[in-house]
Amino acid sequence: NALVSNGTVKGSAVTVSGLEPGTDYIYQVGDGTNWSETREFKTAYETDKFSFSAFGDLQASSIAEMSRFLAAAKTISEMPERPLFSLNVGDIIDSDDRYDCYMYYGYLLNQRPEFANIDCVASYGNHEYMGNPDADNIKFANGHHSAVAAPDFDPELLGTGTYAVEYGNMLVISLDWEHRGPASPSEITQEYAKWMDKVLTEHADKTWKVVTLHYPIFPNA
């Protein structure tokens, strides 16, 4: 559960094993009595050619501004090929404690096939941490595992939004740049460097390495 200023966001997660690559699956979500409509998703296929979508700073501060999600969904729906995953580079919402916006956000993720039927790879921006210092809601929506402990680095300094995920011949690295760990910014940056060196070495065979974070590496201001 994630507490917000005017309610509690509750969610459940399920891990499914034994799935085959490049396969369509259908499912329903229910409580034993009430059930959703039948939904579908497709697992990643073993290929080096695929599409993905990317967006960021949708940052809705009101229900009216959630129309930005509909605009993003329209763009995704017009892609020649259904994207394998959707890359969100942060600030998907204005404040993590806005229960009303998260309710509508959850509705869109649930109802719009452009979001509901593809994987979500999310980086955490500063607004994910506003109103909720642990960014619980976006962590739940994201669903990818954080960096695990290793002798070479301290995962507490990396933040839970730091992780790597593979798609075909691509490696996607997300850095939790807004994370405020128990160390100085320079020490945290050093931990990122050590962790990335390990991950890039382990995935040297990947043709494409994509690093995503909410802030530009070379800001123009």
Give residue ranges: language-model regions.
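Acidic/histidine-rich helix-loop elements
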Residues: 2, 53-71, 94-100, 181-188
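Active-site neighborhood of phospho(di)ester-bond hydrolases with catalytic His/Asp-centered motifs
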Residues: 53-56, 85-91, 119-126, 175, ...
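Sec/Tat-exported extracytoplasmic proteins
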Residues: 59-62, 76-80, 96, 124, ...
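Short, solvent-exposed loop/turn segments at secondary-structure junctions
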Residues: 60, 93, 128-129, 178-180, ...
